[in-house]
Every structure is written in structure tokens, then in C-alpha cells.
Amino acid sequence: LSIAALALGAKHAIGLDVEQQAVTSSLNNISEAGFENQATILWGSIPHPQLNQKKFEVIGANISANVLIELAGPLLSCLQDDGVIVSSGVLETRLCDVTEAFRAAGGEVQSTRQIEDWTASTIIRVNGLV
């Protein structure tokens, strides 16, 4: 996701993963793609101590429905007021659960696309909430 963001014009990307092997692979891939000076890859999840309550314009989250549900509040808390979360990798059978978790945390699903059983959604913060 960091490479895609940088290739699409982001000035800097920060990636998080809970698996150390994924962090190592991401660092190698970013180096091979020539973006090593534009990306930071960290081991862990949000909230993360190295992020110091940083707010993001765009958050990409290609993680399971269970993790999205658990992190709905923290993800929205990391989002700028006019920012957007792009979630992907959610099975259609779990989409309502994810949508409800974000709604309960102060978010709103703006759009959803589906290919076969998989969905991707854009989510914003509802002003005054979170």
C-alpha cells in the first residue's frame, strides 16, 4: 500500500504491520521500488508510539473484518477532519459488521465497491464525532 501511495503521488507514506516478516519484506520492496527516502515502515499497530497522535489525509487498510472492527475508533482518531479511510479485503458477508463498527465509532461509509465476494469501502469521519 505504501508503494502504491507513493507511486500515485504521496510525498511520504507510513506503513504498519504486526508481523515482523511483513515489515522486513515491505522495507525490501520499498527499497527496490526506489522509495526508501519517502517511506517509514513500523512494526505494530495503532495507536503507535512513534506516530505521536499524527493525523493522516488518507489511511489504507487492507486487513480482515475483525481487525477493522476492533480498530474502527483508533483509525478514525488518526484521520484528518477531511481525510478518508480506504478499507479493502473485507468479505461481503462481513461488510455490514464493519460498516456498523465505523458508524458506532463516528464514521460514515461513503462508497463501497465489490468484486466477487470482496469489498472495498471509503470511510470518512462525521464532523464533531471521534
Where is each model-derived feature located?
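Conserved SAM/SAH cofactor-binding pocket of Class I
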Residues: 1-45, 55
